[in-house]
């Protein structure tokens, strides 16, 4: 629920988050209440296929799409398209792989499938993701490969895991601790060397009426990077030569 809270608090939006984790939902709604954001931010405990049928100006998907699986990936992207306003923007952050056959990448994938994320087989090369977006009628605006940043983030996760060794062992036992120690440590190396990565993709509906000038100019840049001051109406983006 952090993104839902942050966007509502700093950008003045009405934000809706969705997760299948009951404990996460309870935690997020408690934080929303503590920060006085009830009515501005909300987190629902739902399967993505049960998201209320309404329209959104912006949709963000943070490393959830790979868990949809290859079989359901196109249906998921189609659903995002249907939930997005015609002038809306879709931000997709998804774990991915480099293209081509690489033996270590195969071993990594088999390990992940068996021990960590069974069925999460939609961590794919970029071409697979872009093809699904375009097939759904979306237009890719920008793509950034943040694999090195991803590696640095996972290193923090690994450090936290090792710092909490005793409490994890007490709660889950040695086998579970060792599996995740190997997984997180291996993930740091895999992401750093380029075997796995993370793509950040911004897209919009591929419509003639979509205003593509919104991506340019100081104001448009601020739309993405500068927090909103509550009570102040953000300026409209302007085109610059």
What residues fall within each predicted segment?
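Conserved SAM-binding loop of SAM-dependent methyltransferases across substrates and taxa
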Residues: 1-12
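A short acidic, Gly/Pro-enriched loop at the edge of an enzyme's catalytic core
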Residues: 49-60
């Amino acid at each position: 629920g952090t993104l839902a809270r942050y966007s509502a608090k700093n950008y003045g939006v009405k934000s809706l988050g969705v997760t299948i984790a009951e404990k996460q939902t309870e935690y997020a709604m408690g934080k929303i209440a503590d920060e006085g954001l009830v009515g501005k931010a909300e987190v629902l405990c739902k399967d993505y296929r049960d998201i209320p049928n309404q329209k959104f100006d912006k949709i963000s998907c943070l490393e959830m799409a790979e868990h949809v699986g290859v079989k359901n990936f196109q249906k998921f992207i189609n659903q995002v398209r249907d939930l997005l306003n015609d002038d809306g923007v879709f931000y997709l952050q998804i774990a991915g792989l480099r293209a081509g056959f690489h033996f270590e990448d195969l071993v990594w994938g088999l390990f992940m499938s068996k021990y960590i994320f069974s069925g999460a087989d939609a961590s794919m090369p970029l071409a697979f993701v872009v093809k699904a977006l375009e097939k759904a009628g979306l237009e890719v605006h920008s793509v950034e490969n943040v694999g090195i940043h991803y590696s640095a983030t996972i290193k923090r996760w690994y450090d936290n895991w090792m710092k909490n060794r005793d409490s994890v062992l007490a709660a889950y036992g040695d086998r579970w601790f060792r599996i995740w120690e190997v997984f997180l440590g291996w993930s740091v190396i895999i992401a750093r060397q380029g075997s796995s990565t993370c793509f950040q993709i911004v897209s919009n509906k591929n419509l003639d009426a979509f205003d593509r000038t919104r991506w340019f100019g100081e104001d448009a840049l601020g739309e993405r990077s500068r927090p909103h001051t509550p009570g102040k109406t953000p300026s409209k983006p302007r085109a610059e030569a």
